């Protein structure tokens, strides 16, 4: 009994471990070693960049061979996504920036592609990597890595600050922090505290929401594979995978919508 628990525990820990590289020592990091700021999860970086390149290749192919008369199935599918995202931007964004639609499209499709990696059998790619390349651990779901989701959220946060300052100037931006919601000099400390918390909570919630949902979904697949024999895993994994498709699309949609809303808020002119 103890040995069974030990094997199952090791299986779960193995699939939740990233392939890590230490930039300081230029060596691969073993799972039992202490982490540092200079350690990169290179499997998350590899798959996120690979999926981004896949998106660019498909978009470039469709743009190059698109036709007006009789569009193909791939072109029609891409145009459907573009129309959907463009409609969301027109409904929710009230500024004039031409960056928002391409950014929203990129965020939406990229997150869907990253989330979809969770539908691949959890042992398939790690076993291939171990057998052919000697890679000890491989985690293929980038959106279940807090570093990836935080990096995306921080980029959105940086754009928010940029547009806040571009729209209102530095003085206007600072004024919105210290004179809102209570337009009294005595309330400046309270206003500043409330606004800073409100501002910083946006990237935190944006990153943790995506990470939490995808991490929990990945963990359920691992638990199914770890506790059930191989011949009975499909009874739980197939229904969960079907339900998980909804989570994959929904989380990408929520991230995109919040990105549009946050950037729309940053285009409002502050009026004291």
Swiss-Prot record:
Q: Name one GO molecular function term.
A: proton-transporting ATP synthase activity, rotational mechanism
* Keyword list, A-Z: ATP synthesis, Cell inner membrane, Cell membrane, CF(0), Hydrogen ion transport, Ion transport, Membrane, Transmembrane, Transmembrane helix, Transport
Q: Which InterPro entries match?
A: ATP_syn_F0_a_bact/chloroplast, ATP_synth_F0_asu, ATP_synth_F0_asu_AS, F0_ATP_A_sf
- Location of this chain's protein in the cell: Cell inner membrane
Q: Which GO terms describe its cellular component?
A: plasma membrane; proton-transporting ATP synthase complex
Q: According to its record, how does it sit in the membrane?
A: Multi-pass membrane protein
**Transmembrane stretches, by residue range?**
42-62, 108-128, 140-162, 177-197, 219-239, 241-261
Known function: Key component of the proton channel; it plays a direct role in the translocation of protons across the membrane.
**HAMAP family, from UniProt?**
ATP_synth_a_bact
Q: Which family does it belong to?
A: Belongs to the ATPase A chain family.
Instruction: State the protein's name.
Output: ATP synthase subunit a
Question: Which gene is transcribed and translated to give this protein?
Answer: atpB
